Amino acid sequence: MAERPYDLVSTPEGVVARVRLRGSSVLVSSLLNRGTAFTLAEREALGLTGLLPEGVSTIEGQLRRVYGQYQRQPDDLAKNLYLAGLRDRNEVLFYRLLTEHISEMLPIVYTPTIGTAIERYSYEFGRPRGVFMSVDHPGQVETAFRNYGLGSQDVDLIIATDSEGILGIGDWGVGGIQIAMGKLAVYVAAAGLHPRRIIPVVLDAGTDNPALLAEEMYPGNRHPRVRGERYDELIDSYVSVATRMFPNALLHWEDFGAGNAHRILTKYAGNCLTFNDDIQGTAAVVLAAALGAVRAAGSRMRDQRVVIHGAGTAGIGIGDVLRQVMIAEGLSPDEATRCFYALGSKGLLTSDYPGTLRDFQVPYARPTAEVSGWPRDGEGRIGLAEVVARSRPTMLIGTSTQPGAFTEAIVTEMAAHVERPIIMPLSNPTSHSEARPADLIAWTQGRALIATGSPFEPVPYRGVSYQIAQANNALIFPGLGLGVTVCRARRVSDPMLAAAAAASSRPTGSARSHTTWYRRRRTGSSRLLNEARSVMPRTLSLTMAN
């Protein structure tokens, strides 16, 4: 195991970090380095005399400097790279800057800019972060974790991705470590989790992205993505080792492909503390948006007719949780299922669907007899326009990654039959959104209740500024992770997710107007943060080891 640069020690003044390192080694440790904020006494004790300019800064002074540097970056990718560099130098300053400007910087460290950073990973590769595990060496999983240098009680959360289904941009191989790092930053900034107690992991099974396979600078396995038994061996090894070495850690699954995400969650959910953000987190945040929208429309969930355009893991996960609410409101399971129309890559899911139905899609397939008179294209597909015209939905949800799929004709058809159409183009990044809020507002004469997956600027329309709600998983997963950690939960349950959704659905302050109808705030109450700090020491004080 790698030697730890510090020990956490309880003192009458609280928990402090007793530093083992000396000299320039302190300055290259991002978690210990405070740069010019080291006092003269700390510099002498840590062997830093002469290694820093003479002046001593406050963290407020450092914040002004780095925020100015950040603002001078020419574009969002440059800002993302600047923040990554700051994190590599001084994590205390990075997280202070991020928490001070969370609304401004969340789209930079997380969606949508993180998608561009992932695409550029081969060219912008710098300091390696996290743990890299290869399908070609599944026996090295334990060695990799040990080399990371954390003990069995030092880890609260492990964020793992195999990078097959990154956001809306697909397979990007080991570049997916960037999405794990982005999630880590949000867990810390929004919920107060300690960055050193979170491990980002990429499970490198290869890639089917031809651009990466041909790129000489690509740092991952340069072979086609491995599937089947060898892939399962890597996943089994990862789960077995992680749960044994870090028994209290929540295993967070991120951006796995449709063929594996549901299967992996189903396999391990009953045996360990595990959470799939794309399935459970997305479902919870969309449930929050849906509950708020239904409330704003003066209706009930059981009265909704829902079209889901994009019947993958996220879309069906959303359907599952909305369906459970309908059942809780009095519908039978069959009645609730009949409220949904889900479309895959080959149109409406039906009993005679022209493609292959995955197990999790089967419950949403409409009987062939029911749609026998509906027009189909030459390949036997029933398209979105026909589904909207025939089903007259009250709620239209997009998880298809097909930009512009919600056309003016489709939206006006929907709005002709419902007073307050609920429309959620959720695909990320922004370039993959099914519609632009400005168009949705114009096409519905300002009547639509809108939530998007990516951030959009307010929309002026007929003298009113419409604040666009973002159904961002960051409203759910940080607080969920904090709660699981504080109470030492053994499983992530459906009631936990329902409680998170209900809390996020309640409007506060400016969220009570126009298209923004549910909670937009930092996750985690001050009480929970205080409890978290009692079990997760924060590196706020330094002492020098003798």
What are these regions (language model features)?
Residues L32-N33, F275-G281, V294-A297, P421-T539:
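Adenosine-phosphate binding glycine-rich loop
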Residues N271-C272, N276-M395:
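Glycine-rich phosphate/diphosphate-binding loop of Rossmann-like nucleotide-binding domains
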Residues R127-R129, G151-D156, H194-I198, F246-A249, ...:
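Short coil/turn connectors at secondary-structure junctions
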Residues A144-R146, G168-I179, P210-M217, A261-K267, ...:
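Short acidic, glycine/serine/threonine-rich loops at helix termini
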Residues E379-G446, F456, R488:
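Long hydrophobic segments that form regular secondary structure
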